[in-house]
């Protein structure tokens, strides 16, 4: 018996895996957002859901979901869980950066450092890992990438957000 023309025939052939190089996806997502966000001074952190498309080669399509003045509160907000319905999430923050000293620390607040620079950071997180891309306002054509080796409170919060989401919340009246 032949399937009706409006029903696709099913096969048992294995579909080749999609190329999900997290760093490549982060760079492409950052490029798209760089053209959409013309600022290195946002009023708050932004959260985007990122669809990668249906082809074997991903084409990131970011979708704005939410914004909050505090990136940690943004990641913990119940509505931010919507990002996990996408293939990936992108967190965008702006601020000040300053050079590290010989111990790997910044002397004082980056915003008060003599060599401070405006920066925009985009962190992409997906099941295949975490990667980040940043640009400086004084060199907007250059990007700095990190394939997931970042540490600190933001890296921990992003990992918790994607890989260890809250199971449920108790609502009391």
List each model region and its residues.
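N-terminal interaction modules that seed assembly of large macromolecular complexes
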Residues: 29-73
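Short, surface-exposed beta-edge/turn micro-motifs
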Residues: 43-48, 86-88, 117-121
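Actinobacteria-biased recognition of intrinsically disordered, low-complexity terminal regions
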Residues: 1-34, 38, 161-173
